[in-house]
Each structure stands twice: as structure tokens, then as C-alpha cells.
């Protein structure tokens, strides 16, 4: 009998989460308010990411930039919604200025270093991209056991992680 071996892409989406609900970010130099509470700041961070560069240089062509969290092949995925907005660092700077952060701000990114393919390398690349828009991001890369316990645990004031990397995959292909 002959065997037909098929290689298919993983249906995992890697993303950065941002604490939007806390009154103040724990690691930020901005006190008394939370930059991520402003949609313009979150959009600025999004437009700062050159996903084609990450796909090419970090992932060596073995990834597909996603516009939504649901991967192709998963029930609920729609191709027309799975379109990324463009990489646009100038727009990012404009959005930050409009939100009241013309000089950017500083914070920490929590990243696993042993969970996803090239996880820490993706975080390092993103940090360089955020720097180009004036946002200083300090990397806190840890093993997955430390990373996940810190990201999921909050306190009375909200989350303890200001910005973090996570992945979402659906082995059942049903969102």
C-alpha cells in the first residue's frame, strides 16, 4: 500500500496582548493612566509591526501574517476579514501624538522563550519596530511555565503583565 503524507500549516495564531483595563501599567514610565486604554495607541502598536519582515527574516517564510485570530481552515474563519492593515510607522507616530504620547512611552513585554517557534526572536524583532515609533519596550523573556503563570495572574488593580505574547490554536478546527 502507498502512503500519502501531507504537510499542512499549523493553525496557531501568535499575538501580542495589551492590558487595556488597568488604570495604570505596572512597567510603564507613564503614571496615573494607561496608554493602552486609548484605541489610537493600540492601533499605533499594530501599524508599527512589519509582519512581512517578521515572516521573511524571523520565520524564514514559514508563517502567514494574520488579520484575525481565527486561522484558515478553522470553522468561523472568513478570508475577507483576514486582511491586515498596512505596516505604517509614520501613521503610528501620528496616532501616538494624537493620543497624547508624542514622545512615546516605555513598558515591558512578557514573552515566552520556549513555547512557540521563534517566540523570543519574534518579540526581539517587534521591540525594534516599536522603537522606531518612539515606544521603548523592555523584554522579559522566560520559560513557558514562568511566563504563563505570570500572564494569567492579575491582582486587585488588574493584570500584572502590561503586554505579552500568546498563541491561540484550535485542534478541533471549530472556533
Spell out what each predicted region is.
Residues 13-14, 65, 78, 115-118, ...:
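Flexible loop/turn segments at secondary-structure boundaries
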Residues 64-98, 113-120:
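Structural transition elements
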Residues 2-8, 17-39, 73-91, 101, ...:
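Short, solvent-exposed loop/beta-turn-alpha elements that line the ligand-binding surface or hinge
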Residues 5, 64-65, 103, 137:
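Residue-level detector of short coil/turn "hinge" positions at structural boundaries
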Residues 11-67, 93-95, 105-118:
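Alpha-helical secondary-structure segments
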Residues 62, 74, 167-170:
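Glycine-rich beta-alpha junction loops
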Residues 1-6, 109, 122, 128-175:
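Periplasmic binding protein-like
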Residues 40, 44, 49, 53, ...:
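Extracytoplasmic/secreted proteins, especially bacterial periplasmic and envelope-associated proteins
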